[in-house]
Amino acid sequence: KDPAMPKLASIHLYPIKSTAGMPLTRALVTEEGLLGDRRYMVVKPDGTFITARTHPQLQLVTATPVEGGLQLRYPGMAQLRLQEADFSRAPQVTGVWGDSFHALHTQAQADEWLSRVAGEPVRLLWLGETSDRFREKTGTRVSFADGYPLLLISHASLDDLNLRSDALHQMSQFRTNLVASGTRPFEEDGWKRIRIGEVEFLVAKPCSRCIMTTVEAGTDRFNALKEPLATLTRYRRGEDGEVYFGQNLVALNEGWIEAGSE
């Protein structure tokens, strides 16, 4: 008999680039990715984006979408609630990995709050209702994500990594949007097109991994042994020298997806 169909085990949203993810039971998929995913980004005053690669403490910031805005939490600091209605919306040129585009300023309270977290002056930018960032590569508008609208990893691939590594790794270290179950390890590497719920996805390319994966889950510390990159380098290195784990997806239509669906 046919093996069981893979399932969508979980969905994860990252409202602010580089901050903590939050689980969703269902999500609306748009051209730009999950609705509400990476719509905000922390930048230096000149618009240069900052991430947990240099500021690992960002991963302890929890951003929760609330009616008309965002609720921010960080250990040892008062919560901050942001309302889109209060945003200055002053345009600012920014960029992500060579793409230059305009985003909108949020508000001074957000800048001050996040500057305390970052330990240096920063600003919080918002994409607005639609992204001003068009990527030729994907043929779509993209959020503040590194390059593709969505990322998928299977539980089996993480289990395989954990069998090979001395450290135990969490899926949260890989900042994936979609987690698949019921597959063989790295089965997703061979997928070309998949359907989840109402949405068909193009499996665009494998995701190359960086130092950010080595921030230990739930902390602001990098792993001293550079895990999981050290282990992944031994068996997931491409011909280009990059280390690959997970698959980048592009949605071919808009629609709803739900955790637990095939």
Located regions from the model:
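Metal-cofactor-dependent catalytic cores
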Residues: K1-E262
